[in-house]
Regions:
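N-terminal, positively charged nucleic-acid-binding surface of large information/translation enzymes
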Residues: 8, 17-118, 470
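Short glycine/proline-rich turn/loop motifs
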Residues: 27, 94-95, 211-217, 363-364, ...
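Anion (oxyanion) recognition and catalysis
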Residues: 54, 147, 455
């Protein structure tokens, strides 16, 4: 398996630090609103890497954080739909005020919606979903270590800051150099007098007296964590000081992942993350999704249009994860047609005698995925197999079922299901109606005779509380 490593600026062979066991940390949602389809495409990346690892016979441990505190409205790098709005207010607190609810109630509401969206897209759940609000002791421990090592200091306002100049490798992920950064470049417009250097960032922020929610007492007073602190603390707690892959959206390269890397490496004295893998932006109708443009699309919007959410998953798979994608309703509708055709074919092929998969097609499929998750090429392998008249239907069924372990499209959904009434032959439909009338009249002899006639024609009738089911 080779993936594009943002820090290495090239494809890297992925070799787990523990043989045949891959560890992945994925930046998760800030739970103050519903995740849009662009966020979901990023979350899909981790699922694809994990599924491919499984196809190689590896096990995985996946950790995805839940940010329910500390992500300020002016923090950069989220790629959200309201970036930069609302000054320095905590996003969760701001939404809680808008909805007239408690902060944690808001966080749990949108966390639940996030898990529902993951399920709709058949994204396998992570092994751990640590919440920032429940990881405060680990953050305090991390900050203590950074202060002790000289990588952090207490500012003039009582907040604790990371000393960016104490980490010489800063900028290795994004290419930004500290000496080139100036106030206003994703930092305060003017240098902050409470910090030693304008590029330093808050590990722990002193809370104003007016803030009564999402605050904790620490050795540095009452306050709340910085956004970047959270990921370092949670990843180190659950995965230790050697993490194979860290995923996230391309927007997170700087400053979030640069800051996280500086914190984790400084605290442990080692290079914690081996590979940084990022998903590219998603546009909708050629534009970045935003409230002002009115083009923010959620998973539930797809469902409400009568489309299968797995058609959205297929639409994502039709593009490379690190290729900017322009999603439209036409693209999703086209994917829906492909999905319906494949499910119909798989159900048809399931009735054929089983046959081994074609080794050549299997090798082509894995080769495409192993080369930086080239999902468009992998889908082309399926299309070629579908049309290949030299391959038996039983073999096609086995291949599509095997490939779906990675694709996650539920291609066998209609196998064994009753055909639609319109597709049932007229003579079979007439017999079903005759049998239903016989059962209503308690003429069980006729009912049994008709059942036997249908069986001779290759149909099995099952009686349920809702009526007859034909297979």
């Amino acid at each position: 398996m080779r993936l594009y490593d943002t820090r290495a600026r090239g494809l890297q062979t992925i070799t787990p630090s523990t043989p045949r066991h891959l560890t992945i940390y994925a930046c998760g949602p800030t739970v103050y609103r519903d995740a849009h389809v662009g966020n979901m495409r990023t979350f899909l990346l981790t699922d694809l890497i994990s599924r491919l690892a499984g196809m190689h016979g590896w096990t995985t441990t996946v950790v995805q954080n839940i940010t329910d505190v500390g992500h300020m409205a002016d923090d950069t790098g989220l790629g959200g739909v309201d970036e930069g709005q609302g000054g320095g207010e905590d996003r969760v607190l701001r939404q809680a005020a808008t909805e007239g609810s408690g902060a944690l109630a808001i966080a749990r509401k949108y966390e639940e919606a996030f898990h529902s969206d993951l399920s709709a897209l058949n994204i396998h759940p992570a092994d751990h979903y640590p919440r920032a609000s429940e990881s405060i002791p680990e953050m305090i421990e991390l900050i203590d270590a950074l202060l002790e090592r000289g990588n952090a200091y207490v500012g003039t306002d009582g907040s604790v800051f990371f000393d960016a100049r104490s980490f010489p490798e800063y900028g290795a992920i994004s290419g930004n150099r500290l000496e080139d950064l100036r106030p206003g470049h994703k930092f305060d417009v003017e240098a902050d007098p409470v910090k030693r250097f304008h590029a330093d960032w808050a590990l722990w922020k002193k809370a104003p007296d007016t803030r009564t929610q999402l605050v904790w007492d620490t050795p540095w007073g009452v306050g709340y964590p910085g956004w970047h602190t959270e990921c370092s603390a949670m990843s180190l707690k659950l995965l230790g000081s050697s993490i194979d892959i860290h995923t996230g959206g391309i927007d997170l390269r700087f400053p979030h992942h640069e800051d996280e890397r500086a914190q984790s490496n400084s605290a442990t004295g080692s290079d914690v993350v081996r590979h940084w893998v990022h998903a590219e932006h998603l546009l909708f109708d050629g534009r970045k999704m935003s409230k002002s443009a009115g083009n923010v699309v959620l998973v539930r919007d797809v469902i409400e249009r009568g489309l299968d959410p797995l058609a959205l998953r297929l639409a994502f798979l039709q593009h490379r994860y690190r290729q900017q994608m322009n999603l439209t309703w036409q693209v999703i509708e086209g994917a829906q047609k492909t999905l319906e055709r494949w499910r119909s074919k798989v159900a048809e092929w399931a009735n054929s005698p089983s046959a081994p998969m074609c080794a050549d097609y299997r090798e082509q499929f894995l080769a495409a995925l192993d080369e930086d998750l080239d999902t468009p090429r992998a889908l082309t392998v399926l299309r070629n197999l579908e049309k290949d008249a030299t391959i038996s239907e039983g073999s096609k069924f086995e291949f599509f079922a095997w490939a779906d372990a990675f694709l996650g499209l539920d291609l066998a959904r209609t196998v064994g299901q009753t055909p639609l009434a319109a597709e049932i032959p007229d003579d079979v439909q007439a017999l079903l109606e005759e049998r239903a009338a016989a059962r209503a009249a308690k003429d069980f002899a006729t009912s049994d005779r008709v059942r036997d006639e249908l069986a001779a024609m290759g149909y099995v009738v099952t009686d349920t509380p809702d009526g007859q089911v034909l297979n």
